[in-house]
Amino acid sequence: MEKLNETIINDRVETTLTTHDFYYDLPDELIAQFPSAERDMCKLMVLDRENETVDHKVFRDIIDYLNPEDMLVVNSSKVIPARLLGVTEKTGASMELLLLRMLDSGEWETLVRPGKRAKVGASFDFGGILKATVTDVVDGGNRVVRFDYDTEKYKTVYEVLDAIGNMPLPPYITKRLENKSDYQTVYAKEEGSAAAPTAGLHFTPELLERIKAKGVGYGEVTLHVGLGTFRPVKVDKIEEHLMHGEYFHITDEVAREINERRAKGGRIIAVGTTSCRVLESVSTPDGKVHPIDGETSIFIYPGYKFKAVDALITNFHLPESTLIMLVSALAGKEFVMNAYETAVKEKYRFFSFGDAMLIV
């Protein structure tokens, strides 16, 4: 696997589209606050690009749209309970720490609230179990912290987080999460995400087994989703928007199977925009996928030419977000925005815990 020392950034495509071109009106009651009672029984909207048709199904019907030569590519990143509530050791004042990413040093880049008093040397206590000390202040005001905990009781910091941390739910989910597993995919393995790769939440172990039994390939990549995924686009010209970098990797084995199946006429179906961004980051113009370990800030919007992804499973995204722009790049802006209007009329559930879309 090739190790990259620089962030993958794609060439920006010139476009006359503005951020507002991706706006749609969404009633608050359509923002899903809870997951479906059964993961694979949410609604599924199927967009057929060739015929420009829209079908309405349930998610477990997705198997009917998959061929034996196809391959599903999922993001196996695991959400960490990255929201910590504690007190400042000096004054006892309440504070919140949000973990953004682990650095090579083993320290963490974090967001501290309130942050004004979080100077280098400041320390915070979390229930007497975990202590955080600020070691640096970086661009944007984020704080780098060092953690201290009982290493005899907890083997890793992730075990500490599992014990005392809270899931970093998106701001549009206002209800308390009863079960942490509701915000994890059933195949989540590698800790590191600050948000779930939500397209994968609809799969159950049973549905995946049925899909594999049909002969459909299955491969896992990893992209650790950062909080930047919720960052709004604040510029009018979309090509001027700056994407945050996110760590990813794809193994030799997965890259090889993708290339083999595609060479035989199979489609590569990305499960989620994160898997899609990995595949497009590691592919060459001829569509070949390469095993790479690195960081990507690829920004996909209409005008982008897809190289590796043939179909996409995704959720319904926020207006004017980079994610709805990516979906529009694959299926066409007018087709997608019309489909979103239909979804509102048909009372689909939106965002992280909402319903799904398949683009073929």
Tell where the protein language model's regions lie, with residue ranges:
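Surface-exposed, charge/polar-rich loops and edge strands
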Residues: 2-360
